[in-house]
Amino acid sequence: MSTIAASAKIHPTAVVEDGAVIGENVVIGALAYVGPKVTLHDDVRLHNHAVVSGLTVIGRGSVVHPMAVIGGTPQAVRHDGSETTLEIGERCIMREGVTMNAGSSDGGGKTIVGDDNLFLANSHVAHDCRLGRHIILSNNVMLAGHVTIEDRAILGGGCAVHQFTRIGRQAFIGGLSAVNYDVIPYGMLNGNPGILGGLNVVGMTRSGIERADIHKVRRVYKAIFEAEGTIRGNAAAIDRNDYLDCPQALEIIDFIGAGSDRAISSPNRGK
């Protein structure tokens, strides 16, 4: 049987399958569907015609708008059909037509979305993605499988992100861009193919990063992308001791040094 809190409000035309767990003050609108292995935490709201299926957990206060399909099976040809999961954090907003898939059998089996994220109409989160907090996916953004996006990144409308790509903290991706390679924290990328266009100085300033730290990040950026040599080699050559008081600079150095299946986006389409 389903576990449905007494304070939940479920429209008589909605379908809540036996086994679903429905928290306090959840609202489920007309013709919405909730699968038998779904958990909706307190204060979640499903608008009319929203679909939540699979082994999906949606955190407190999140909102799913009409025609969104959350928790569908992964669009991965190698998936063996086993049951995998989708975990969505608190206070996320999924607008009309958003799709999010569960993980795949060969990718860890989990798609994980953090708290306080905004997914605008028709954006897509594929299998095995890992998303942090306070991220914005604008209309029609497409994330392929295994993408990682760090906190406070913003992706403009219609951009597409290649599988296994990483997008760093507070990066800004321009609309209609093709993100083929990793994007450093605080980077700005535009175009198809995507070209690194410098640092997201406006975003850094708005988030309260001191001007002195922004200058240090610029110095690191120049040392990595404007000097002779490879991106990873240049990053490895930087003396971390010079930036111990600037976590943003160290974050860029560590992001590049962490290694990845993808190259690093640069002003020259990758070195």
Curated annotation (Swiss-Prot):
Gene3D superfamilies, sorted: Hexapeptide repeat proteins (2.160.10.10), Udp N-acetylglucosamine O-acyltransferase, C-terminal domain (1.20.1180.10)
Q: What is its EC number?
A: 2.3.1.129
Where is it predominantly found? Answer: cytoplasm
Q: InterPro entries attached here? A: Acetyltransf_C, Acetyltransf_C_sf, Hexapep, Hexapep_transf_CS, Lipid_A_LpxA, Trimer_LpxA-like_sf
Q: Where in the cell is it found?
A: Cytoplasm
| GO BP | lipid A biosynthetic process
Q: Which GO terms describe its molecular function?
A: acyl-[acyl-carrier-protein]-UDP-N-acetylglucosamine O-acyltransferase activity
Q: Provide an example Pfam family for this protein.
A: Acetyltransf_11
Q: Which UniProt keywords apply?
A: Acyltransferase, Cytoplasm, Lipid A biosynthesis, Lipid biosynthesis, Lipid metabolism, Repeat, Transferase
Keyword Magnesium among record annotations: no
UniProt record similarity statement: Belongs to the transferase hexapeptide repeat family. LpxA subfamily.
Function as written in the Swiss-Prot or TrEMBL entry: Involved in the biosynthesis of lipid A, a phosphorylated glycolipid that anchors the lipopolysaccharide to the outer membrane of the cell.
Q: How does it assemble?
A: Homotrimer.
What is this protein's name? Acyl-[acyl-carrier-protein]--UDP-N-acetylglucosamine O-acyltransferase
Encoding gene (name): lpxA
